[in-house]
């Protein structure tokens, strides 16, 4: 959720550290800080709020030194104040930390009983005090680091400076952390994209690893203190891509990138020339499995729900899907089959824990991820990249539709492998997928004016209801989630057939009801539900040309999209939902790219 960077080398580092934090802003944060060491003395600057505030602090009181660590913080333990911002200092020890120390209360009581005086409300400070205690007890720096790691529990990434060692950064992970190799200098980052301005040669630590980093190299140890080797690899992270271009926000840019990135993603899985599935769609033996488990969180979970409809209907493959935070606690009776995990970052803590749970039970693991260098990708048997490129806005847009595109291609591969679709049906499906990017471009180029008018009206509402049937139900949930995330309106979403089971009581003349209803096999039933709503609510109907002609309902507004094949409808119909949320948030003046309390990558449970 936070960002860590570190540099040890031969040039002044304070400004470079702040620059390295900038690509990590997309993760979300509420304070920032930097620490350097010069002439054997630790020094730091911290600021509440954005990096601009930290830059002002550094402008007023610059930091010197060729070694340092820096951090952006999302408050978990303790308020988002300068006092609670990292780095934390204790007796010649400086610490920055991502994640949660789960046993911090127990450790804090123990340390306080021994005389430790805590200056902050954070869990991180116990790490600094533990290290200081072990140094007082006579342990060397490495021994103190190892002893501390034996005591703390949780998912974390750490970077540490010792005041009596002016040439070394120590680091540890049970969460994302990468080491960058430079020319006479070394780098540390919680995301390879932070290191992209400096190097593309990366070593990824694995859970339990800790490292001693000097300007000419790194020594890596496992949890037991044994020296280990981790491979270097060339990272594809590209800092120059993290740019809004001519758009007001990253979210707007990413919405309009969808036709291009979906074309790239589809090209990886289907051959649009001969209209057939590529071998990448066969990385899981769909012909041999009797069932499929899917686990994911947030928007990825909603993509997974749509995937469940597709796999079950078109490939006749039973799917068990659960939110990752609940998945392993349900103790699902897992057969030795396959499991699919969906995550943009590939670092989502709950999803990663579910992946490891399934792996321990002998399942073959597939990962649908955007970050091909992520922990989830590295721990999976088969990786299905969504190829969306960097997504900076916290609210998922292009990652969602690319996840759907990949799941649609996998569904085609599964249907082919299981003999549930014919060769002609495979070709028709891939023809529809191949046409999708152009249709998405047409929609994005045509609907913005009417979306802006609707969004201005929605910005005055406190509540909005979203309805859908079939795959349009998860899409309704996704539309509500997008509006909730970035506008702070409180939308609700339901299966259209559930109106009379409670939700109908919410509807009055002031409530907009957004109904997603392509003219599919569910359309007539959805129209019946809309007739009930029309007696008291204001309907915004999102449908296609055939649906608009057939509905004959008095609506507040009807958004008419092209008539498309059922398999690509979720991707096409997601576009007005994304734009409605975006423009509503813009009219309300919220922080669209970094909404309050939310982070791009949730790396703690």
Curated annotation (Swiss-Prot):
Transmembrane segments: none annotated. Disulfide bonds: none annotated. It holds the Pfam family GATase_6. SUPFAM superfamilies: N-terminal nucleophile aminohydrolases (Ntn hydrolases), SIS domain. The lineage of its organism: Bacteria, Pseudomonadati, Pseudomonadota, Alphaproteobacteria, Hyphomicrobiales. One of its GO terms (cellular component) is cytosol. InterPro entries: GATase_2_dom (IPR017932), GFAT (IPR005855), GFAT_N (IPR047084), GlmS/AgaS_SIS (IPR035466), GlmS/FrlB_SIS (IPR035490), Ntn_hydrolases_N (IPR029055), SIS_dom (IPR001347), SIS_dom_sf (IPR046348). It is an enzyme of class 2 (transferase). Residues 2-216 form the Glutamine amidotransferase type-2 domain. This is Glutamine--fructose-6-phosphate aminotransferase [isomerizing]. Keywords: Aminotransferase, Cytoplasm, Glutamine amidotransferase, Nodulation, Plasmid, Repeat, Transferase.
């Amino acid at each position: 959720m936070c960002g860590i960077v570190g540099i040890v080398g031969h040039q002044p580092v304070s400004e470079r550290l702040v620059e390295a934090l900038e690509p990590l802003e997309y993760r979300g944060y509420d304070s920032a800080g930097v620490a350097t060491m010069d002439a054997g003395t630790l020094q730091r600057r911290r600021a509440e709020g954005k990096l601009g505030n930290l830059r002002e602090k550094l402008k007023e009181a610059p930091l010197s030194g060729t070694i340092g660590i820096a951090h952006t913080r999302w408050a978990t333990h303790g308020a988002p104040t300068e006092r609670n911002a990292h780095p934390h200092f204790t007796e010649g020890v400086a610490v920055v930390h991502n994640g949660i120390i789960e046993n911090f209360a127990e450790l804090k009581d123990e340390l306080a009983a021994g005389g430790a005086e805590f200056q902050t409300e954070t869990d991180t400070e116990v790490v600094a005090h533990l290290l200081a205690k072990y140094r007082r007890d006579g342990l060397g720096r490495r021994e103190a680091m190892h002893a501390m790691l034996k005591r703390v529990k949780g998912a974390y990434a750490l970077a540490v400076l010792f005041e009596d060692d002016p040439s070394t950064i120590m680091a540890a992970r049970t969460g994302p952390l990468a080491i960058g190799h430079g020319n006479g200098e070394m780098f540390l980052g919680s995301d390879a994209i932070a290191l992209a301005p400096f190097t593309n040669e990366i070593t990824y630590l694995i859970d339990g690893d800790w490292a001693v980093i000097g300007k000419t190299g790194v020594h890596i140890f496992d949890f037991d203190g044994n020296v280990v080797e981790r491979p270097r690899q060339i990272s594809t992270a590209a800092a120059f891509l993290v740019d809004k271009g001519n758009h007001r926000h990253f979210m707007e840019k990413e919405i309009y990138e969808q036709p291009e990135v979906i074309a790239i993603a589809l090209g990886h899985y289907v051959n649009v020339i001969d209209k057939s599935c590529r071998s990448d769609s066969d990385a899981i033996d769909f012909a041999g499995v009797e069932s499929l488990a899917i686990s994911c969180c947030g928007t990825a979970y909603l993509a997974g729900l749509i995937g469940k409809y597709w796999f079950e209907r078109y490939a006749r493959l039973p799917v068990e899907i659960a939110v990752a935070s609940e998945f392993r606690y349900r103790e699902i009776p897992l057969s030795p089959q396959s499991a699919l995990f969906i995550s943009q970052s590939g670092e989502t803590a709950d999803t990663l824990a579910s992946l490891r749970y399934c792996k321990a039970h002998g399942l073959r693991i597939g990962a649908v991820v955007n970050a091909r260098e992520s922990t989830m990708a590295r721990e999976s048997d088969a990786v299905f990249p969504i190829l969306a490129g960097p997504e900076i806005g916290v609210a998922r847009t292009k990652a969602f539709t690319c996840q759907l595109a990949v799941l649609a291609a996998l569904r085609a591969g599964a249907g082919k492998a299981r003999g549930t679709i014919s060769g002609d049906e495979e070709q028709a499906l891939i023809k529809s997928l191949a046409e999708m990017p152009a249709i998405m471009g047409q929609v994005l180029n045509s609907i913005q004016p009417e979306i802006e008018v609707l969004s201005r009206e929605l910005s005055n509402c406190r509540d909005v209801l979203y309805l859908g049937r079939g795959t349009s139900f998860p899409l309704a949930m996704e539309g509500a989630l997008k509006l909730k995330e970035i506008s702070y309106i409180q939308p609700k979403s339901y299966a259209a057939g559930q109106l009379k089971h409670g939700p109908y009581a919410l509807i009055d003349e002031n409530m907009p009801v957004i109904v997603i209803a392509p003219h599919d096999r569910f359309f007539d039933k959805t129209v019946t539900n809309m007739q009930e709503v029309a007696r008291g609510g204001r309907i915004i109907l999102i449908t296609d040309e055939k649906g608009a002609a057939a509905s004959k309902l008095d609506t507040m507004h009807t958004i008419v999209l092209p008539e498309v094949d059922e398999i690509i409808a979720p991707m096409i119909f997601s576009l007005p939902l994304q734009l409605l949320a975006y423009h509503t948030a813009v009219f309300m003046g919220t922080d669209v790219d970094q909404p309050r309390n939310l982070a791009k990558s949730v790396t703690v449970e």
